[in-house]
């Protein structure tokens, strides 16, 4: 008879069997309690992270965004039609594209976002200003509102009378050839800095806001936009509103809610939560099975 078998038989028939089983039961219950508490804490952290991300993106992303399939720009002729749909409070015309920003010898690549007056009324960016004001025109001069990261990268001084940002945009309307001069390859203009916003580094390092007219002229896209950004009156009915917009505009347009605009990120969070559920389920299941068999042995 092996050592393991003799030890097992002694435990089974020993007077100390009950005490030993009680000890194992206590350990199993402790493990089960710790596992349950850990699962609650971890899931609470994930839920808190998700809510935090939603609150951050809420200031930057619209509740509904409309873009055109297979086309970067489209004519700004649908605004009134969309505005007439039930549950819509604001419709903003937006044009956005990559640009190069230059201040003296410093340069950064960023997204220039041209917005109309309706966007300004929504107060989404202006409430996150750390310096200056959210204005785009003053004394016949064009202004931009930049992210804090761009300010540091370019060494910008807000509201300086002597400092302007030089903005370059690739001339997409012309075919590039080796003989083209830089002047023909790029459209360029100047912006003064009206304010600085701080939301999240991904936005702060990459975005500059200005007027719709300035951006359309720079991109050589007069009367064209890249998207509509829409705010709704009742968020509970956002899916119904989205479907109405799709029905009105037709299949040529892509209509996304705020969650769908960040679908990849939220999908990762949900996947991680499911993995956590699965791991803790296995731990709790094994602990529960252990307790069950210990109770049978008592």
Regions found by a protein language model. Name each.
Residues 18-26, 234-298:
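Peri-transmembrane interface segments
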Residues 160-252:
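Basic-flanked hydrophobic alpha-helices used for secretion and membrane insertion
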Residues 35-46, 284-288, 292:
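Alpha-helical transmembrane segments
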Residues 14, 18, 84, 199, ...:
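Membrane-interface junctions
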């Amino acid at each position: 008879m092996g050592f393991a078998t003799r030890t097992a038989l002694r435990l089974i028939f020993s007077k100390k069997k009950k005490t030993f089983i009680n000890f194992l039961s206590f350990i199993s219950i402790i493990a089960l309690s710790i596992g349950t508490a850990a699962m609650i804490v971890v899931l609470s952290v994930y839920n808190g992270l998700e809510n935090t991300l939603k609150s951050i993106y809420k200031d930057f992303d619209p509740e509904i965004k409309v873009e055109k399939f297979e086309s970067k720009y489209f004519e700004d002729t649908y605004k009134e039609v969309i505005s007439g749909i039930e549950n819509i409070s604001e419709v903003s015309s937006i044009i956005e594209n990559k640009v190069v920003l230059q201040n003296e010898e410093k340069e950064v690549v960023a997204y220039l976002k041209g917005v109309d007056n309706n966007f300004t009324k929504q107060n989404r960016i202006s409430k996150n200003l750390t310096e200056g004001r959210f204005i785009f025109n003053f004394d016949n001069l064009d202004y931009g509102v930049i992210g804090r990261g761009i300010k540091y990268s370019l060494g910008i001084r807000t509201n300086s009378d002597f400092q302007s940002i030089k903005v370059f945009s690739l001339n997409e309307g012309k075919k590039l050839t080796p003989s083209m001069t830089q002047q023909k390859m790029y459209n360029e203009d100047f912006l003064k800095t009206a304010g600085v916003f701080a939301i999240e580094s991904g936005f702060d390092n990459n975005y500059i806001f200005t007027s719709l007219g300035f951006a359309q002229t720079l991109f050589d896209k007069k009367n064209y936009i890249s998207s509509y950004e829409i705010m709704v009156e009742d968020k509970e009915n956002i899916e119904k509103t989205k479907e109405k917009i799709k029905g009105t505009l037709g299949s040529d347009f892509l209509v996304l809610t705020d969650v769908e605009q960040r679908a990849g990120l939220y999908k990762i969070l949900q996947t991680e939560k499911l993995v956590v559920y699965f791991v803790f389920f296995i731990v709790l299941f094994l602990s529960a099975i252990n307790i069950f068999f210990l109770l049978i042995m008592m």
